[in-house]
Amino acid sequence: MSKLTKRQKEINSRIEHEKQYTIEEAVQILNDLPPLKFKESIDIAVNLGVDPRKSDQVVRGATNLPAGTGKTKRVAVFAQGAAAEAAKEAGADIVGFEDLAESIKAGNMDFDVVIAAPDAMRVVGQLGTILGPRGLMPNPKVGTVTPNVAEAVLNAKAGQAQYRVDKAGIIHTTIGQVGFTAEQVIQNAEALISDLRRAKPATSKGTFIKKITLSSTMGPGLSIDPVPYRTAK
């Protein structure tokens, strides 16, 4: 068995593994941990009362986070004509059409989000085996296939959390950075969970928001009391 590092020992001394924390308490703990050489994300995992094996219970979407994510994302847009110009004005980092597709095929992947106008999907569709495994394939369910590419660019730049339930019925996404205030994380978490409640499949029965966990990139997973988040505020 590998030895615990000094940081791991300190983490273990600060947390109660059986406790359910408030988000405010959890953020305080994560912010007070010994800092690393990089800025850690604050991530959330929400266990949902769904069976993702059933196609009508696959929960997928995107939430515009009120406090952002703390990171600036590079955005690539597939568009032409007026839509391409609008994307550039909105702050897109890369805008193109067939030329962008060829660049991606050549291995140029210097972006975090891909947005496409509907008429560009005939081009983007050729990139499924490249973009799909990386979670970058545009999809109308998360607002990345849209006639209003400028708005999508603004949302991505402002801080948007995309999510899709995994095989275990859990969504994982980033809702901030270490250093965010508790209020910022609470605002983002409430916005996300509110969207999740609205996305509850009609065939999902029983408790929908089953469990919530907050963590930092290299920090502990802290169990959050889910009860206050099961109903609209």
UniProtKB/Swiss-Prot annotation:
<keyword id="KW-0687">Ribonucleoprotein</keyword>
<dbReference type="GO" id="GO:0019843">
    <property type="term" value="F:rRNA binding"/>
</dbReference>
<keyword id="KW-0820">tRNA-binding</keyword>
<dbReference type="GO" id="GO:0006412">
    <property type="term" value="P:translation"/>
</dbReference>
<dbReference type="InterPro" id="IPR023674">
    <property type="entry name" value="Ribosomal_uL1-like"/>
</dbReference>
<comment type="similarity">
    <text>Belongs to the universal ribosomal protein uL1 family.</text>
</comment>
<dbReference type="InterPro" id="IPR023673">
    <property type="entry name" value="Ribosomal_uL1_CS"/>
</dbReference>
<dbReference type="InterPro" id="IPR016095">
    <property type="entry name" value="Ribosomal_uL1_3-a/b-sand"/>
</dbReference>
<dbReference type="GO" id="GO:0022625">
    <property type="term" value="C:cytosolic large ribosomal subunit"/>
</dbReference>
<comment type="function">
    <text>Binds directly to 23S rRNA. The L1 stalk is quite mobile in the ribosome, and is involved in E site tRNA release.</text>
</comment>
<dbReference type="InterPro" id="IPR002143">
    <property type="entry name" value="Ribosomal_uL1"/>
</dbReference>
<comment type="function">
    <text>Protein L1 is also a translational repressor protein, it controls the translation of the L11 operon by binding to its mRNA.</text>
</comment>
<protein>
    <recommendedName>
        <fullName>Large ribosomal subunit protein uL1</fullName>
    </recommendedName>
</protein>
<dbReference type="InterPro" id="IPR028364">
    <property type="entry name" value="Ribosomal_uL1/biogenesis"/>
</dbReference>
<keyword id="KW-0678">Repressor</keyword>
<dbReference type="InterPro" id="IPR005878">
    <property type="entry name" value="Ribosom_uL1_bac-type"/>
</dbReference>
<keyword id="KW-0689">Ribosomal protein</keyword>
<keyword id="KW-0810">Translation regulation</keyword>
<dbReference type="GO" id="GO:0003735">
    <property type="term" value="F:structural constituent of ribosome"/>
</dbReference>
<dbReference type="GO" id="GO:0000049">
    <property type="term" value="F:tRNA binding"/>
</dbReference>
<keyword id="KW-0699">rRNA-binding</keyword>
<comment type="subunit">
    <text>Part of the 50S ribosomal subunit.</text>
</comment>
<keyword id="KW-0694">RNA-binding</keyword>
<dbReference type="Pfam" id="PF00687">
    <property type="entry name" value="Ribosomal_L1"/>
</dbReference>
<dbReference type="GO" id="GO:0006417">
    <property type="term" value="P:regulation of translation"/>
</dbReference>
